[in-house]
């Protein structure tokens, strides 16, 4: 019976596909005949053929028909009809652009219509609204902008286009910061895929790495500032919503493959189609790189190193990949995405920061030293209008396998063993060569969401909308393993007790409401969200997240004043790590360890004032944003554990402008930021930390010929300084303090004073401070179109500029030199 049912379903699907293919072939034949009529000057005949069959056209055929109908109307000097069909075309495809072969009148008409329209996004208020009405500063990155940037991953796209976002390198996985707030990994910015959270519930991490395909994206919507009033925890500094293409956008199959220096191999496959009311989009992407071997000048200290070679940009032994599917049928939508990423740290752990021999260390389930994540995300939603209220319900499921396997040292660390005196096996391990830390956990979470949207109109000058929603999520860590590797291949025994301590589950409840009301040119947008979280130890977190924005709209400009507060709870992994370390390093009971090692949520308050101008000069848009941020309870990695010791106050100015012409585009941004208050290692440094005071980007695109398109990206960063706790000085301070204590206990006063003086000197040097020079990087690229075949070439860091970056809990990390890639793509 089951086989018979499957056979019937398969037969029906096959028939539908054959019917769709038959209709497509018929419609394509009609269009080609009309196009032939147009080319020989029989414009009225071409117009009649298309008008008679337009209702039956779908996908790219319909778009081509609307374009040709507009051209026919122009040929007959019917500007009104030409404009009508051009608007219909842009309704079908808002990102359509005229080609060099199109008449100038048609190109000008399309650009004029597009200029009169403001792009819409859904991220800022969970409903479609124009950029002018968005309550917080927002950056919209289109598919064309992604191509023009030449970016290889999401990190590079965001750094190129989003003011205030910049790359940090914590010698960890791929990372990015917003307005100077960052961590070891990317856990302060909420990253979503079509509104579905990608950040881990265990670590809060969503790395903007090669595990997220760029080819599948239609646009990227970025909210610059706190957004917990809608999205709760993790949306501390910004929200990035990745919007995929739809099947109709692609209408076929696209394949792309590339190869470059340092062992780079990249491939992408996309499939998209719309069958009646069913829209289907499927994507797959993979990337591999052996990395660039370099010998940078690193700092010397008392700890040795086995090699001078550092490998930068290595993607482990297994390629990063991203596979997924999205299907829409009327109000029903399903999405599934799985991605894998594996990034190798160039240097050893923390501020030891030494080169190491990567291939000498053992593997765990095939995983070599790296930061490795494999995730699965599924989302099923249904949208329906009921009594003028638009309702949307969603079911979500997420599953991740997380591995942090980091080399500590290739030489004995007697100073490190002091911290584990209560665990002789681990203390002994640090007296051996080739030590590393291996942490692995498997998490899963599921949730249910319900959102509603009611729109009302009192009269032409009074209208608005009321949004509301509630959500429940459950997270659990099913497995946790913690090992110390020594002698490169040996490991300490796994502790069943520690593994059990690592396991746990947490529950999340939240509700929100948002009111948007417009009185003529004035819009008030106010929202509030309440989050209630039950932690693994039954403690509670209760957070209120308000937002209030005033927007004044004019045809050519707008003003925005907004306040918002956000929070992010301390990651489960950090809290459990503190507990495990406290249990290992002392003999206190677990309950006491939990209370002593508890971490509080981080929070941020932000006040922003924005002025934006639209089309003051044809094709030119600009924005100036002034912000004040105050962040408290920021979590700082303190060698091997975590503390709420960070506080940050900063002011800044963000400038954006874009100029779009038929054959030329330019996107520019500049950020100036000054930190008023900043604390590192319990000391006020009151300066930007790993954040340039001035950073700027210019991305240019030029349609040189019908087939050739060129693009350039210039990125400038002013001098910056890194401040971190120095583990070398921490070891020295601990060693001298212990020797002083021993001398004091034996009554050796003079010796005691000498050791205390050395301990004080080490303590004074506890904050590691180094400058990084200003840099200007240049990236170039080109695309050559031959029919449906596209040839591409991109080169990054054209002048092979040598530079270093840093981040949290590390020293200076060398960056990539000149990398290039050739690619070829074909659209079937």
For every predicted segment, state its role:
Residues 196-224:
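Short acidic/polar hinge/loop motifs at secondary-structure boundaries
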Residues 239, 244-273, 284, 596, ...:
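Short strand-turn segments of transmembrane beta-barrel domains in outer membranes
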Residues 328-342, 371-538, 623-624, 657-660, ...:
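Face-selective signature of the C-terminal outer-membrane beta-barrel domain
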Residues 392-396, 402, 558-560, 597-649, ...:
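Membrane-embedded beta-barrel scaffold of Gram-negative outer-membrane proteins
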Residues 518-524, 617-632, 643-729, 825-827:
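Gram-negative outer-membrane beta-barrel transporters
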Residues 719-723, 730-732, 753-758, 783-828:
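C-terminal beta-signal and adjacent terminal beta-strands/loops
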């Amino acid at each position: 019976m089951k086989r018979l049912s499957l056979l019937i379903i398969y037969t029906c699907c096959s028939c539908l596909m054959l019917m769709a293919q038959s209709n497509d072939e018929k419609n394509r034949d009609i269009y080609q005949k009309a196009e032939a009529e147009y080319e020989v000057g029989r414009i009225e005949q071409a117009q009649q053929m298309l008008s008679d069959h337009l209702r039956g056209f779908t996908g790219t055929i319909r778009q081509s028909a609307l374009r040709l109908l507009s051209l026919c109307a122009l040929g007959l000097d019917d500007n009104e009809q030409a404009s009508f069909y051009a608007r219909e075309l842009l309704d079908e495809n808002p990102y359509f652009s005229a080609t060099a072969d199109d008449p100038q009148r048609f190109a000008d008409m399309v650009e004029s219509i597009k200029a009169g329209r403001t792009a819409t996004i859904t991220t800022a208020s969970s409903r479609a609204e124009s950029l002018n009405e968005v309550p917080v500063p927002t950056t919209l990155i289109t598919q064309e902008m992604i191509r023009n940037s030449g970016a290889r991953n999401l990190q590079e796209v965001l750094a190129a286009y989003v003011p205030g976002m910049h790359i940090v390198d914590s010698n960890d996985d791929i990372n990015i910061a917003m307005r100077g707030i960052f961590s070891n990994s990317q856990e302060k910015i909420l990253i979503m895929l079509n509104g579905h959270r990608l950040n881990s519930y265990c670590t809060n991490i969503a790395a903007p790495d090669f595990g997220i395909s760029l080819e599948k994206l239609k646009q990227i919507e970025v909210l610059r500032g706190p957004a917990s009033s809608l999205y709760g925890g993790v949306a501390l500094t910004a929200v990035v919503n990745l919007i995929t293409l739809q099947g109709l956008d692609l209408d076929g199959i696209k394949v792309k493959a590339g190869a470059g220096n340092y062992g780079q191999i990249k491939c992408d496959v996309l499939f998209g189609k719309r069958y009646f009311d069913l829209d289907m989009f499927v994507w797959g992407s993979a990337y591999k790189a052996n990395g660039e071997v370099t010998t940078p000048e690193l700092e010397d200290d008392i700890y040795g190193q086995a090699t001078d070679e550092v490998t930068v940009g290595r993607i482990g032994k297994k390629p990063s990949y991203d596979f997924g599917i999205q299907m829409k049928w009327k109000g029903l939508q399903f999405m599934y995405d799985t991605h894998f990423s594996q990034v190798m740290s160039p240097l050893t752990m923390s501020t030891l920061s030494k080169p190491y021999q990567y291939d000498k260390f053992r593997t765990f389930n095939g995983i070599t030293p790296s930061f490795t994540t494999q995730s699965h995300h599924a989302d099923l939603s249904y949208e329906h209008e009921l009594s003028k209220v638009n309702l949307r319900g969603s079911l979500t499921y997420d599953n991740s396998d997380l591995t942090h396997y980091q080399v500590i040292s290739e030489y004995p660390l007697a100073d490190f063993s002091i911290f584990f005196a209560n665990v002789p096996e681990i203390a002994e391990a640090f007296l051996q060569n080739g030590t590393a830390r291996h942490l692995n956990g498997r998490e899963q979470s599921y949730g249910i969401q319900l959102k509603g949207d009611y729109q009302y109109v009192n009269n032409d000058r009074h209208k608005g909308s009321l949004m509301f929603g509630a959500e429940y999520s459950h997270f659990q860590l099913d497995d946790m393993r913690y090992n110390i590797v020594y002698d490169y291949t040996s490991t300490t025994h796994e502790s069943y007790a520690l593994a059990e301590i690592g396991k746990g589950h947490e529950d999340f409840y939240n509700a929100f409401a948002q009111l948007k009301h417009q009185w003529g040119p004035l819009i008030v947008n106010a929202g509030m969200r309440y989050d209630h979280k039950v932690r693994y130890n039954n403690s509670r977190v209760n957070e209120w997240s308000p937002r209030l924005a005033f927007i004044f709209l004019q045809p050519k400009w707008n003003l925005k004043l907004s306040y918002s507060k956000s929070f992010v709870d301390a990651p489960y992994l950090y809290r459990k790590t503190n507990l495990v370390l406290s249990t290992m390093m002392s003999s206190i009971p677990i309950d006491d360890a939990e209370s002593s090692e508890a971490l509080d949520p981080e929070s941020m308050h932000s006040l922003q004032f924005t002025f934006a101008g639209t089309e003051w000069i044809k094709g030119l848009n600009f924005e100036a944003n002034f912000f004040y941020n105050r962040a408290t309870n920021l979590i700082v990695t303190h060698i091997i554990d975590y503390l709420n010791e960070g506080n940050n106050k900063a002011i800044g100015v963000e400038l954006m402008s874009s100029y779009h012409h038929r054959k030329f585009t330019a996107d520019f941004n500049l950020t100036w930021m000054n930190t008023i208050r900043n604390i590192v290692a319990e000391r006020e440094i009151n300066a930007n930390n790993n954040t340039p005071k001035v950073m700027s980007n210019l991305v240019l695109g030029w349609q040189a010929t019908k087939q050739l398109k060129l693009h350039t990206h210039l990125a400038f960063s002013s001098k910056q300084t890194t401040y971190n706790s120095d583990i070398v000085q921490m070891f020295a301070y601990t060693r001298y303090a212990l020797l002083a204590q021993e001398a004091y206990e034996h009554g050796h006063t003079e010796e005691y004073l000498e050791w205390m003086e050395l301990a004080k000197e080490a303590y004074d040097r506890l904050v590691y401070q180094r400058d990084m020079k200003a840099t200007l990087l240049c990236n170039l690229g080109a695309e050559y179109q031959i029919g449906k075949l596209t040839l591409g070439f991109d080169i990054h860091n054209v002048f092979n500029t040598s530079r270093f970056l840093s981040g949290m809990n590390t020293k200076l990390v060398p960056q990539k030199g000149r990398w290039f890639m050739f690619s070829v793509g074909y659209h079937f």
